[in-house]
Structure formats: structure tokens, C-alpha cells
Amino acid sequence: MALREQLHRIGLALVLVVGTGTLGVADDKGRADEHGRIQQVVVLDNCDPTTFNGAFGPGICLNVTGGQGVPLPDFLAALPAGHPQWLFYPATLSITRGDTVRAVNQGGEIHTFTEVEEFGGGFIPGLNDPPNAPAVPECTVGYANISVASTRLIQGSSLLVTDLQQGVHRFECCIHPWMRMEIEVQ
């Protein structure tokens, strides 16, 4: 399936999701609970609504920056490595066991914040590096996979990650797989 068709299908699905809600989205006031602190991760992109929505349909990209976004041709030119304005910030985070991680989507597109064993491809083959590389197991079959569906972040939403055990945990966006970070739990 061509990249344009894959993204168009995702766009249609995402428009439906925006209208109906999602799994795994939490409303959090940013307070610490009895177990630890809340550490924030910001999920960012800078899509240009005119070119993204023109190609894939309304709602795929919202103008959240109020300024000029990255036009779709520039985004596509950055593939397969991925565009640097699509990222998790910070790229690494050190927390204490018992802390909660709050991933907040401040970008214009929908993303996932999915824990993976190893970094690799997402569920849109044309966005992988190398192109058409297989998805990592946690990202296979897109939103039909509960690991993906439960970690979906629509624009403006947040997701809480709790009970991380000691060690290094890897998170990636299953749509834009160059969006990656590591969380070290001490």
C-alpha cells in the first residue's frame, strides 16, 4: 500500500478517534501522589495543517503553534530518518521508582507513547527507517494492537505511565518511529 494511502487511512481513523475518544488517555492535575512525583514528557511535532490536511483529509493536523508549520513536502523529504521537529522531550529521563510519567501531546498530530523492548519500525511501513522495515512487536497491526491503542495521544491529551520497575525503559511513537526516548528508573 502506498504511503499516501496508508496516511490517508490513518487520517480517516484519527478523525473518527477525535470524535469518539480514545483508550489510555488520562486527566491528571500534575500532582504527586503518595508514591512519588509526576515527571512530564512533551510529545511534539510541527505539522503544517494546510499541506497535511490537504493531502490526507481534515483533522490529521491541527495548528497548535500558531505559526508556520513544516510543510508536508519538507516532512517527506526528511524520511526515512524522520523530521527533527517530531520528538519526545526530553529524549532521556531519570526517575525514581514510584514516580509517574505524564506524556503530554502538544503537537498537531496524533502520536503514541508506547513502551517497546527494542527501538524499531512503526505500523506505517513508509515512515520506517529503512522504508518498509517491519514494525517492532509492540507496534504491529496499528490500533488493532492494544499496546498501541492504549497509548494513543490525540492532540492536547495526556497519558500516565505508572509502576515502572527499576531499569531502562524505551518508548517510541508507533506512527513516527524516530520519536524515541529512554526512561531510567532508579
Predicted feature locations:
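Short intrinsically disordered, low-complexity segments
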Residues: 6, 17-19, 98
